[in-house]
Structure formats: structure tokens, C-alpha cells
């Protein structure tokens, strides 16, 4: 499961878990971001130099440069290699493994999965989720100050998501598309 920034796959994974219980199947949910991304401090060291932090130059802390390294540039190489081995090792008869995370369908990882699903939502819904504290920037454990979280999204998180989504559609990768504007009314296409 991959998706646009702030995609919420929790309900979807829980529904799959419920169906697995009814069918007598096991379920393992694997957080690809926790398994592959660099630490928040390491990602900050990559992104912060692209943002202007001097309030004398930029009083509103609005300006910066777009990060162009994609999700791949935010991933820890050793952790990603371990993840590439762990996912196939998790396959067992009578068990379903669900991998979720931003960038989990990048070319380097997509062959690990049998079914590829992309969660999409409108930018407005994404911003509302950020403002409600429902999103932490890539590599972060908790939401930060709203304006800084949004700023980081504009220059990094949104950019990674848009480029990833473009590549996925260009190559006809997703098997399923989920409209995630309303987690209580997911639309699977």
C-alpha cells in the first residue's frame, strides 16, 4: 500500500485483518517507512539546507528549494536491503503480509509485492489532515509545528509523493486505486 502524503491506510488494513480472521488467515502488517527510512535527524540534515531559516531574509519562513532526491534519497541503504530480504521471508501459507508506507511502490521495492495498491486524496484533504495533527513528516515520529510541517511538505513530502504517483501511473503499476478522501467511505477502483 502506497499513497499520497497523509494517506490513511489504517482502516483498510484493519478491514483486511477482520476478513483474514473470518477466513482463518494470519495477517502481518509491515510499516515500510519504519523499516527503510533514515532517521528524522538524518532526513532533516538533507532537507533543512534547502530551506531558508533566517527570519531576517525570510520573515515568514516561506521560501526554500525543492528536494529532488525522491523517496530513494531518504532511505537508509542497509535498512532497505534488510527490508528487501524480510518481506519475502514473511511469506507463509495461511498468512497475508500487508506492506504499507509512503514510497513503498518505488521501482526498487515493487517486485516484493503480489498486489499493488495506491491511496490517493485531494491536496485539500491532505492539508486538513496535517492541520488536525494526523500526519508527521517523513522520518518523524510525531507531528511538528503546523507551519513547519506544511513547509516541509511543500519542499519535500509532497514533491516525493507527486513524482512517485506520476511514475506509478506512467508505468501502469497499481492494481488497485483507493480514493482516500474519507477513510470511513473508502472507494476502491
Where are these regions (language model features)?
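ATP-dependent NMP and nucleoside kinases share a basic, alpha-helical "lid"
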Residues: 83-139
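N-terminal active-site beta-alpha-beta segment that forms phosphate/nucleotide-binding
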Residues: 1-41
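ATP-dependent small-molecule kinase phosphotransfer cores
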Residues: 25-96
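NTP-dependent small-molecule kinase module
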Residues: 11-24, 124, 131-136, 155-189
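Glycine-rich loops and low-complexity Gly/Arg-rich segments
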Residues: 24-27, 53-56, 122-126, 140-145
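Conserved segment of the helicase C-terminal RecA-like domain
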Residues: 142-155
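Structural motif
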Residues: 1-6, 100-103, 181-182
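Conserved beta-strand scaffold positions in the cores of enzyme catalytic domains, especially
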Residues: 27-31, 114-118, 175-178
Amino acid at each position: 500500500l502506497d499513497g499520497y502524503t497523509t494517506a490513511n491506510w489504517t482502516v483498510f488494513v484493519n478491514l483486511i485483518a477482520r476478513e483474514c480472521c473470518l477466513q482463518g488467515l494470519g495477517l502481518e502488517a509491515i510499516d515500510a517507512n519504519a523499516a527503510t527510512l533514515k532517521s528524522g535527524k538524518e532526513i532533516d540534515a538533507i532537507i533543512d539546507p534547502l530551506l531558508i531559516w533566517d527570519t531576517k531574509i525570510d520573515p515568514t519562513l516561506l521560501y526554500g528549494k525543492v528536494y529532488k532526491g525522491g523517496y530513494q534519497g531518504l532511505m537508509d541503504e542497509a535498512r532497505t536491503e534488510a527490508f528487501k530480504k524480510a518481506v519475502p521471508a514473511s511469506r507463509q501459507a495461511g498468512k497475508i503480509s500487508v506492506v504499507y508506507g509512503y514510497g513503498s511502490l518505488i521501482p526498487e521495492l515493487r517486485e516484493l509485492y503480489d498486489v499493488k495498491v495506491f491511496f490517493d486524496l485531494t491536496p485539500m484533504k491532505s492539508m486538513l489532515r496535517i492541520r488536525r495533527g494526523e500526519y508527521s513528516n517523513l522520518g518523524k515520529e510525531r507531528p511538528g509545528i503546523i507551519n513547519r510541517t506544511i513547509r516541509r511538505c511543500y519542499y519535500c513530502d509532497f514533491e516525493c509523493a507527486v513524482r512517485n504517483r506520476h511514475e506509478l501511473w506512467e508505468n501502469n503499476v497499481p492494481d488497485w486505486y483507493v480514493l482516500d478522501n474519507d477513510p470511513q467511505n473508502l472507494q476502491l477502483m
